Amino acid sequence: MIYDVIVIGGGPAGLTAATYIRRAGKSVLVIEKAAFGGQITRSSNVENFPGYISVSGAQIGDMLLEQAMNQGAEVELEEVVSVSAAGEGKTVVCASGAEYTCRALIIATGAKPRTLGLENE
């Protein structure tokens, strides 16, 4: 299958992009290497999320994933190891050996915290 769009990164930006891509009637695959929801899932209490007085980051991550999937977005828990553009398509290769092809690619890999290597960090 050739997807209209592949989104690399399943955090808030990637999942929101996938939701809007599906609402536009395009096929989309979201590839995330660790956990869907991104860094927000590390927050135990979020008090500035519209519509909620208080909600956990994990709940926000779950809601974003559920909404994207409800719209028809496909999701894969894979690590992307390479991307190549040949001709009109782009090929995304994962560590498992799986290959996916798309017409457009969004890279929404977010960030990760730096660690000091301390015990119990």
Can you say where each PLM-predicted feature lies in the sequence?
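Beta1-alpha1 glycine-rich phosphate/pyrophosphate-binding loop at the start
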Residues: 3-71
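FAD-binding core/adjacent interface of flavoenzyme oxidoreductases
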Residues: 1-8, 23-24, 29, 61, ...
